[in-house]
Amino acid sequence: MNNIQIFKIELNNYRQFQGVEEISLETSPDKHINVIEGQNGSGKSNILNAITLCFYNEEPHIDDSNDRGLGADPVANLKELEAIDVGESVRGHIEITLGKDEPQYIFTRKFRTAKVDDDEYNSVIEDLQLRQKFGADWQNVENPNTRLREILPTRVHHTVS
């Protein structure tokens, strides 16, 4: 499949993105590129992290050092986590809509972050899910990782990360 484009990314309680945030990335014949700009800490790198987490269950652009860098933060939005009690959790998801001329696939990866202590969290990332458009209907697809490799070969992932 050639000319796959991401139409939309929906982030729900993912890192800096509190609540549901939709990022439209549709192109048109006269608009072939999207530019994402913003101040440091506004979430630009985490948009790329969200894509790789959704597709490949990896966040290669996270700083894994122990100096409270991004890698030290929970997957779920920190403001949402601060508002809950120990033992409760915040749920979220990353949803990516892509296709050729129109949306054909919706990949979703859900997560849950539990508040273990006031400054300690535990995140669980669920398996990848896929809905594919057949005619006018959207249907769940078994083995979404296999379909993902057909749409976006592994070499594409390694080029990005």
Regions found by a protein language model. Give the residues of each.
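Short, surface-exposed linear segments at secondary-structure transitions and domain or protein termini
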Residues: 28-32, 113-127, 147-159
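Intrinsic disorder/low-complexity detector
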Residues: 36, 42, 48, 120-124, ...
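N-terminal intrinsically disordered, low-complexity tails enriched in polar/charged
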Residues: 1-9, 133-148
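Conserved P-loop NTP-binding catalytic core
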Residues: 37, 48-116, 138-156
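Generic structural motif
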Residues: 14, 28-30, 99-101, 112-114, ...
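Pre-Walker A-like glycine/lysine-rich segment at the N-terminus of P-loop NTPase domains
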Residues: 1-56
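Short polybasic amphipathic segments
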Residues: 9, 90-97, 117-134
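A general secondary-structure signal for short beta-strands and their flanking turns/coil
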Residues: 3-4, 20, 87-91, 104, ...
